[in-house]
């Protein structure tokens, strides 16, 4: 029985782009964005290493931002709000706001990844890209 049919280069770019753009689903649903690249990964992992790499990268980035960003944001505000009454918390507000902005910056990063992959470029998330490449090589 023949193996899976490889994707065309155009289809590879399209599915990689969709994986990265799925970060925008988080704006509407709050947390369902990582499911899309995970589904794309399992559907196309045997047909395209390019799509597998970008979908797994997008999934892990979104998961890390969702869990890590949510935890850090909650912690930052849990520390800042009580300290505001001691005036020390006023110094914490800029840091809490910066941490709160990180998930929104991740949206921009995901869109940037979508643009890069739609043009056929090899986009890599900082730290995550090399880790995923190692996972797929093993």
Regions found by a protein language model. Give the residues of each.
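Membrane-interface extramembranous regions at the lipid-water interface
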Residues: 1-64, 112-138
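Hydrophobic alpha-helical transmembrane segments in multi-pass membrane proteins
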Residues: 16-36, 59-110
């Amino acid at each position: 029985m023949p193996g899976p049919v490889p994707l065309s280069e155009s289809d590879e770019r399209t599915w990689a782009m969709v994986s990265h753009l799925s970060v925008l689903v988080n704006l509407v649903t709050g947390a369902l964005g990582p499911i899309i690249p995970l589904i794309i990964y399992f559907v196309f992992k045997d047909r395209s290493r390019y799509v597998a790499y970008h979908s797994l990268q997008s999934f892990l980035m979104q998961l890390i931002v969702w869990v890590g960003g949510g935890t850090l944001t909650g912690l930052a505000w849990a520390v800042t709000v009580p300290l505001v009454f001691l005036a020390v918390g006023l110094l914490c507000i800029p840091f809490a706001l910066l941490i709160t902005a990180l998930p929104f910056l991740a949206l921009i990063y995901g869109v940037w990844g979508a643009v890069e992959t739609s043009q056929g470029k090899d986009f890599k998330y900082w730290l995550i890209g090399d880790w995923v490449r190692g996972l797929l090589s093993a």
